Amino acid sequence: MKTKSLTFALVASLATVFVASSCSSDDEPEAPVAAQVVGSYTGNEVIMVDNDESSNETKTYEITKTSDTSVDMTVPEWGMGMMTIPSFVVKNIPLVKSGNAITGNVASYSGTVKNAKGDEKAYVVSNVTLMFSDKTVVGTYSLKYGNMPFLMTTTFTGTRK
C-alpha cells in the first residue's frame, strides 16, 4: 500500500512539473509594439491637392523605432511638374496595440527641410494616422509645405519587405 501511495505521489509530482514547464507561446514575452512595425513599406501613394488627384505612384516609406512605443515615419521625396518636395520625417508617433492591430496618431508635427536649391522650407504635417496589420500599413496625413496655398492630403498603403 505504501508503494502505491509513493508511486501515485511521484506520478502526480512529475505531471505537475511537465505541465508547469510546457513550451507554450504564452510563456514568451511579446516584442515591444514599435519593434513589431519597424521596416520599409512599399506601396501605392495617392496625393490629393484641392480635391484633385495630383499623384498616384509606388513609393517606399520607412518606419524606424524611437522607443518601445513610438516610431518615426520617413516620407519619400515626390514631385509634381516643376516642383519637388524633399523627403521629410514625422517624429515620435505614439503607437497603441489592440488585438492584432497597431495604430499611431499625431494631431500635428512641424519641421524644416532643405529643397534642391538649398533653401530651408518649413512643413506642417497634420492628422497623421497609421494603421498596421500583419505586414501592411495604411497611412493618411495632410501636408502644408512652404508657402503653398493648399493642403496636400496623402493616403499610403504599403507592404513591409
Which residue ranges define each predicted feature?
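Bacterial Sec-dependent N-terminal signal peptides
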Residues: 2-6, 16-44, 146-161
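Outer/extracellular conduits and scaffolds centered on Gram-negative outer-membrane beta-barrels
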Residues: 11-12
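Extended beta-sheet lipid-handling architectures
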Residues: 40-43, 56-58, 73-75, 90, ...
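Generic short beta-strand segments
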Residues: 40-48, 74-79, 105-114, 140-144
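N-terminal glycine/threonine-rich, aromatic-flanked beta-hairpin/loop signature
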Residues: 52-94
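Short, solvent-exposed coil/turn segments at beta-strand boundaries
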Residues: 64-72, 96-101, 127-138
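Contiguous, well-ordered beta-strand patches that form the walls/edges
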Residues: 78-131
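Edge beta-strand at a domain terminus
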Residues: 87-94, 98-99, 134-161
